[in-house]
């Protein structure tokens, strides 16, 4: 399926390196994507209101709503913007591809809190988090963990695998 079709079906992808879209404001991007996802027109005023509430939760300046999508955003701003998109699009399944990449400790906490709030409000939301580091997982507390080596799942279990990986490294599985 094309990415737009996957999005309409309820799949969300937060990329490791979010793309910039010069000329497309965050607000207009979200209006178009929310309308495509729901097949309903959305009031720009209502959308802005929802955006501003989430931007406040994600410690984003409200001016970002009118800036071009990811253009000139720092790494942390791009990641927060992706969580904003995830919140407003209300996907059924989300893939967070190295969402913690390049985040300082404060930004990581804000992003993780946002993801947790989305998951709490949408208990049936499936989230696949791809990461190389334990820090994000410490905040998200995944129910299932899969260890991949060379593209293959070599072990599956609960959060205890995260702790084992952190203390023993991949050597425990090689």
Q: What do the PLM-derived regions correspond to, one by one?
A:
Residues 1-12, 165:
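ABC ATPase NBD coupling module
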Residues 95-99, 106:
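Walker B catalytic motif
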Residues 122-132:
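Conserved H-loop
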Residues 144, 148, 152-174:
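Conserved beta-strand-loop-alpha-helix hinge in the C-terminal portion
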Residues 86-87:
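ABC ATPase C-loop
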Residues 108-123:
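Helical segment within the ABC ATPase nucleotide-binding domain
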Residues 9, 13-17, 23-38, 50:
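Q-loop/switch helix immediately C-terminal to the Walker
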Residues 37-56:
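Short coil-to-helix "N-cap" segments within the ABC nucleotide-binding domain's helical subdomain
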């Amino acid at each position: 399926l094309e990415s737009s079709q996957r999005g309409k079906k309820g799949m969300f992808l937060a990329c490791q390196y979010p793309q910039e879209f010069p000329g497309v404001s965050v607000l207009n991007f979200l209006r178009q994507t929310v309308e495509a996802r729901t097949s309903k027109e959305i009031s720009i005023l209502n959308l802005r209101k929802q955006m501003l509430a989430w931007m406040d939760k994600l410690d984003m300046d409200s001016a970002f709503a009118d800036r071009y999508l990811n253009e000139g955003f720092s790494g942390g701003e791009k990641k927060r913007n992706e969580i904003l998109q995830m919140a407003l699009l209300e996907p059924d399944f989300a893939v967070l591809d190295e969402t913690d990449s390049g985040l300082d400790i404060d930004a990581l906490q804000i992003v993780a809190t946002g993801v947790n709030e989305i998951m709490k409000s949408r208990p049936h939301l499936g989230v696949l988090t791809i990461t190389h580091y334990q820090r994000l997982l410490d905040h998200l507390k995944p129910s299932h963990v899969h260890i991949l080596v060379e593209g293959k799942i070599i072990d599956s279990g609960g959060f205890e695998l995260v702790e084992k990986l952190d203390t023993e490294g991949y050597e425990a599985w090689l």
